Amino acid sequence: CLNRGLGAVPEGAFADPRHEALGWRAYREDPQGEDRTDWDALRIALGVPETGTELTPDSFILEMGFERLNGVDFKKGCYVGQEVTARMKHKTELRKGLARVEGEAPLTEGAEIVSGGKAAGTVLSVAGTTALAYLRFDRTEAGLEAEGQSLSFERLD
């Protein structure tokens, strides 16, 4: 059973390596204590993707911000996907990737994001008026809209 919390790291737990504000994690047979933190809202605010939500089998780890989240090390030896990841890092600029978007009202997961009448991305996870989205960065200059509202965005690569 996964236990999570904020504050001092208890014995047998470890600090979440993705972001210091995510606190600690511990895997135990029985849950200990009750933490009422809204973990989805916290990870969305911090721009941390979740497996099965933002991270799919088709995801490229650099597009999902893994370098920023301590999820890839370019000094380490061999790892699965190393060639593609290294090529993306050193030979090109990311054209697509994870972004935090902010609307005027709550968004709907799966909503299409458009810019200048062209598809520019998709809303992936929502917490209030903040969401994680997958965007084509080359289509963001004309401004972003989803569900009839303007969006601001921040790249998370």
Regions found by a protein language model. Name each.
Residues 1-49, 115, 146:
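Acidic, low-complexity central loop/insert segments
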Residues 64-72, 86-157:
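Glycine-rich, small/acidic residue-mixed loop/short-helix segments
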Residues 38-90, 94-95:
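A mid-sequence, solvent-exposed acidic-amphipathic segment
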